Amino acid sequence: MKKTTLLVILDGWGYSDSDYFNAIKNANTPTWDSIWQEFPKTLINASSLEVGLPRGQMGNSEVGHVNIGCGRVVYQELTKIDKAIEEKTFGDNKAIGAAIDNVIKNDSNLHLIGLLSPGGVHSHEEHIFEMIKIAKQKGIKRLYLHAFLDGRDTPPRSAEKSIKKADKLLQDLNLGYIASVCGRYYAMDRDNRWDRVEKAYNAIVNANADFIYDSALEALEQSYARDQSDEFVIPTCIKKDGHLVKVQDNDSVIFMNFRADRAREISHAFTDESFDHFPRKKHLNINFTTLTEYDSKLKCAVAFPPEQPINTLGEVLMKNHKTQLRIAETEKYPHVTFFFNGGREEQFEGEDRILIPSPKVATYDLQPEMSAPEVTDKLVAAINSGKYDCIVCNYANSDMVGHTGNYEAAMQAIEYLDKCIARLKDAILEHDGNMFITADHGNADMMVNPETQKPHTAHTTNLVPFVYVGHKKAQVALEHGKLSDIAPTLLNVMGIAQPKEMTGKTIFNFEK
């Protein structure tokens, strides 16, 4: 019977001494409190340069899991694209050049789709603005921006500033206009809510929407009047001089998001010949280009293809003939699989995966426990089975409920998680295993912005916990650690040599 090493990633569980609308600190968490007092622990970095992001940039789930799973600082797409813009090589990119050439050759339209936001988690509006300028320089005559609105990694009603910037730039360049707006709730689903994606797709491609207005700003104002914040803006078309924009054959579409997980579904709707999740009028003959690779199965050009890291934690475990399990509910399943494996879709030999469906609710404050009880049932069974050397799991609650801005619901989510942690602790200690608890970034640790007194729905840049639960004696060996130090720590406790590609350091030393 194997002694399991378990890594528990509490998504969005940051650390803050402040009790100001801190759902984690103010929730009733007897198990977490006792673990924090009794077992070896430290705080580690999960944002900024320490995870390969620009200085001061908050971390996110994709970045966090890549850094944890790879055991090294992985420089993120945001950083790479920023560098290309800074070095003035962005416009020389082959895939972007081909998309522009297609438009010029066919005298067709260039469509930019993506999250118009300064959030820096899924996209950055500066990339969109740079793309607009390059299109003008390259001789594009008609450019249409289909703006997805944020309100999740940014304040809930903050899109006006971004829309005004985009409007002014397009007007100054006499190039085109914002042709549709849509909350990310619709265009950037990742939970197979194809009815949402269908609404976004139809607005962009067919100019078919529930609402039509004369400007993007008017669309936003009317959405607010319906009490729909940026994230939930119903897909809306913009009519200019009596004209509605559609995506037509021979057009080029460039998807400006750099993060994969919430860009996949609508990309498949654009590109799959045999797409069947909702009816399309026809399969478009277009040039579809993505800023980064969203899914290796997508048939499209990629401007910044991925670099495949070697000797990730999963690969090292496989090479050492260890069994491993990855488990999460739908919202975070790609993170413990694709992202944790450094952008690899395929399972390693000896790697099992369990996907627990996320509850079908409009927003997760309506069901703060999400699917944590079911995840825990499967986890406890896996520990008891003695089948796995290493288990990696993710609990989505503190992030997904944190994003709703509902403080009371976030506290309920934390309290549900505390009960789950109690069950895991008992199972691990009973079987003489090792459990590490950490987070990929903060979120529920600040539910209200202290400066504005408004709901804070974005991630935080706070440190995150890293705690060891087990019978081994452990001492903190590394102060000021970071997410990339977690994999070396797991290898250390498992007695496996750390490969040279892993540049992280072990956080705890364990008595032999």
Curated annotation (Swiss-Prot):
Chain sites annotated for binding Mn(2+) 1: 399, 403, 459
Residues that bind substrate: 122, 152-153, 184, 190, 259-262, 332
Query: What would you give as a GO molecular function for this chain, any one?
Result: manganese ion binding
Pathway named in the protein's UniProt entry:
Carbohydrate degradation; glycolysis; pyruvate from D-glyceraldehyde 3-phosphate: step 3/5
Q: How is the cofactor bound?
A: Binds 2 manganese ions per subunit.
Q: Which GO terms describe its cellular component?
A: cytosol
Protein name in UniProt: 2,3-bisphosphoglycerate-independent phosphoglycerate mutase
The record lists the organism as Francisella tularensis subsp. novicida (strain U112)
The encoding gene is: gpmI
